[in-house]
Amino acid sequence: MAFLKKSLFLVLFLGLVSLSVCEEEKRENEDEMEQEDDEQSEEKRALWKDILKNAGKAALNEINQLVNQGEL
């Protein structure tokens, strides 16, 4: 009976340890995914910033050309 008790405690302890390790790995994976999402969001913001900046420059150049043509 004592042998069975010790075996049961050992199995429960090992199960608890493995569960703890799995939960820790799961949290690490979730943190990595959140970090990747944040990096992708930053890249998208930078891309939109560049696109809008270039579009603004192009529009300003066109307006300047139209104004210059009207003055001639």
Curated annotation (Swiss-Prot):
The keyword Signal is annotated on this UniProt entry: yes
Signal peptide segment: 1-22
Tissue expression pattern: Expressed by the skin glands.
Disulfide bonds: none
A biological-process GO annotation: defense response to bacterium
InterPro entries per UniProt: Frog_antimicrobial_propeptide (IPR004275), FSAP (IPR016322)
Cellular component annotations (GO), alphabetically ordered: extracellular region
Taxonomy, superkingdom: Eukaryota
Pfam families, sorted: FSAP_sig_propep
Propeptide position ranges: 23-43, 71-72
Keyword Iron-sulfur: no
Residues bearing PTM Glutamine amide: 69
TM ranges: none
This protein's UniProt keywords: Amidation, Amphibian defense peptide, Antibiotic, Antimicrobial, Cleavage on pair of basic residues, Secreted, Signal
Subcellular location: Secreted
Record's function text: Possesses a potent antimicrobial activity against Gram-positive and Gram-negative bacteria. Probably acts by disturbing membrane functions with its amphipathic structure.
Family the entry assigns: Belongs to the frog skin active peptide (FSAP) family. Dermaseptin subfamily.
Identification of the protein by name: Dermaseptin-B6
Natural source organism: Phyllomedusa bicolor
